UniProtKB/Swiss-Prot annotation:
A motif (Q motif) lies at residues 13-41. Residues 451-461 have a biased composition (Basic and acidic residues). This is ATP-dependent RNA helicase DeaD. It catalyses: ATP + H2O = ADP + phosphate + H(+). DEAD-box RNA helicase involved in various cellular processes at low temperature, including ribosome biogenesis, mRNA degradation and translation initiation.
Amino acid sequence: MAFPEYSPAASAATFADLQIHPRVLRAIGDVGYESPTAIQAATIPALMAGSDVVGLAQTGTGKTAAFAIPMLSKIDITSKVPQALVLVPTRELALQVAEAFGRYGAYLSQLNVLPIYGGSSYAVQLAGLRRGAQVVVGTPGRMIDHLERATLDLSRVDFLVLDEADEMLTMGFADDVERILSETPEYKQVALFSATMPPAIRKLSAKYLHDPFEVTCKAKTAVAENISQSYIQVARKMDALTRVLEVEPFEAMIVFVRTKQATEEIAEKLRARGFSAAAISGDVPQAQRERTITALRDGDIDILVATDVAARGLDVERISHVLNYDIPHDTESYVHRIGRTGRAGRSGAALIFVSPRELHLLKAIEKATRQTLTEAQLPTVEDVNTQRVAKFADSITNALGGPGIELFRRLVEEYEREHDVPMADIAAALAVQCRGGEAFLMAPDPPLSRRNRDQRRDRPQRPKRRPDLTTYRVAVGKRHKIGPGAIVGAIANEGGLHRSDFGQIRIGPDFSLVELPAKLPRATLKKLAQTRISGVLIDLRPYRPPDAARRHNGGKPRRKHVG
């Protein structure tokens, strides 16, 4: 079908022009939003006017605010039944969207927003539903579970959003989405957002949306070319941060974290390690925030530990580095963060600490910014110790030309004559005294095992089976038109797993094999056994190869096969 195009030609210059709820307007001002993005300027008026909307938008365009702001402006917060339903493909996105609703609705005192996703306690979700939630954000699989348990009532839903619809269909949730839509009232306002518009999405839109406006908005590469971007895979973040600060030359740095509590905790640890650091968050009074920013600008402090909200609008030219201690869950925050460096035409550097389980977030940032992040290596112990020795030598050189040297030279010479101790020993003792008993050099990392040292470069590396994984059987295969993405999506959402928890996946004609953590909790196994993909019960269970079964029964082994 052909969609009418919504033109943003007369789009508002500010959020105040969009006639949104005054309390919502106040909240987005607190968040730091000043003017709407292209998709917000086009979508918010259409949704406020009651139209259905199809948004062709990638991550990083501001689409969450584009649908959350008008929904919050129109719901009845005195009614505790679900009025707004948002369907998303992953638990991470469910949490992200729910948090956004909470921020934009901060001044709607009776507002309750409930995220529903696999891997989370049913008891917590049931309590939230009994308490009453006007906004429910969730993944299709867990939504279906609640519908079948009759614990989720969608009969009074006025607003429905399908976010990242193409991802949901790719992950095999098409039937679940249709089932959920069938439980909602016929007359409701629907918004569908998708990065692409394949035939399946067009068909879904034609079936459930009425004369929708189509808004097309591509994410801009809002990252300046003068900012270098890289990431480091780390296990112990505080140790990694210390190494980077000791080795990387920087003028001033912002360290971004997710929580207010983390700002002060990390700043305190940095001060204890000899760095000039301060913290700002949304809880810091404005006067104190201004004093801290002035100290950063004047060079009285060099490291600022901050949350996203606290750093909005920060413009200090001497910030040469931005370090994402906690990787942001949305690309808008990432682009804003690294925009704090590279000001006034200066070059800047942005670094992300990432764990293996967070690599999918890294890929989302690359996709949205259309820039490849380079992997950097964590400074080694040798790198750190080389810098410490060099700085120690510099401190001696600086002290030799400083005031008061004559007095201490006389005292040291007297000590040398009276105790007959070499001058070098006296200097070493004074250096130890200055350290306060603290080790000067960083202890070496434990040596790599022989197995890790043996790279076997004389032949191609084959994928090695991870010892922490075991093979499970799922009762869906090629004849069910199921791909690896659908299996990963369903199991990750319902089992509370991350993509890094998966090993090899082999699709057979009638069933498939998937490698998962060997020590899955019994409750998780039970839940996954009842999970459905495209309506088919996957009946997940540990896999026992036919040859192993025959050997166990005294028979001859047979060739291993799948499906």
